[in-house]
Amino acid sequence: MKLKIYLLLTALCFQVTCLASTDNEEKTTNRISWEGAISGDAWRTEFSYHYMLSPYYGFGGSIGRIQGLEDFTGGDGWLVDEDSQRPSHLYLSPSIHLDLPSIVKIGKIGIGLYAEPGLMLTIPYERINFEDHSMPYPKHEDRHMSSHGGNWAFFNVKAGLNIHVHKNLCFTVGYNFSTFDINTTRRTMKYNNKSIEPLLPKKENLHEITVSLVGYF
């Protein structure tokens, strides 16, 4: 059901932008952006490129990194190394970018709306280094655990305001919703053949505030 709703919204947005397109608009073919985002449990940064088929829609994608803000220190008898306490993921995100015409103009500044539905594709592998304290000191061991599978494809959709300060430059402020789980790979890990998932935060969807710098050429 969620997938059907997601695809329906994407199709409706696409149709609206097609109808809004006019032959008189100046066409820019390429859109590049740098985006930063923050949520309650992670920060994210990404670089994106979209080939604009019209001033209002285009296809492309982004590459980025997301890192958790909450430290995971381990469990009974084992202590996670400092450099492994916060989950971190690289990802690719194919997407459709939609720009609606400016709805407000203040001098030369135009303010409009944008939307960007897409996918978030991660590498289903992560490694945690830890000290095993189950043996008396000084017999502590340096060990590691790694993920085995787990979810790697997630839906996400961005929406917000375009603030055009020049025909080739704008800023955006928006919101991103994603089904991405920052601990997705860690939920498959085991310590002494026992899942560590009960020690991890409850799975939640991602809700972010985003800002970006955008160039058109």
Feature locations, PLM:
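Hydrophobic, lipid-facing positions within transmembrane beta-strands of outer-membrane proteins
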Residues: N30-I32, W43-F47, L90-P94, A153-A159, ...
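Predominantly the C-terminal beta-signal and adjacent terminal strand-loop region
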Residues: V157, N162-F217
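Transmembrane beta-strand segments that form the barrel wall of outer-membrane beta-barrel proteins
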Residues: N24-T45, F59-I66
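Cleavable N-terminal export/targeting peptides
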Residues: M1-K27, F217
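Short loop/turn motifs that connect adjacent beta-strands in outer-membrane beta-barrel proteins
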Residues: S21-T29, P55-Y56, P101-L113, V165-F171
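Short sequence motifs at beta-strands and strand-loop junctions characteristic
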Residues: A37-D41, S84-Y91, M145-F154, P201-N205
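Extracellular loop and loop/strand-boundary signature of outer-membrane beta-barrel proteins
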Residues: R31-E35, D76-Q85, E141-S147, S195-P201
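Gram-negative (and chloroplast) outer-membrane scaffold detector with strong preference
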Residues: Y51-P138, E204-Y216
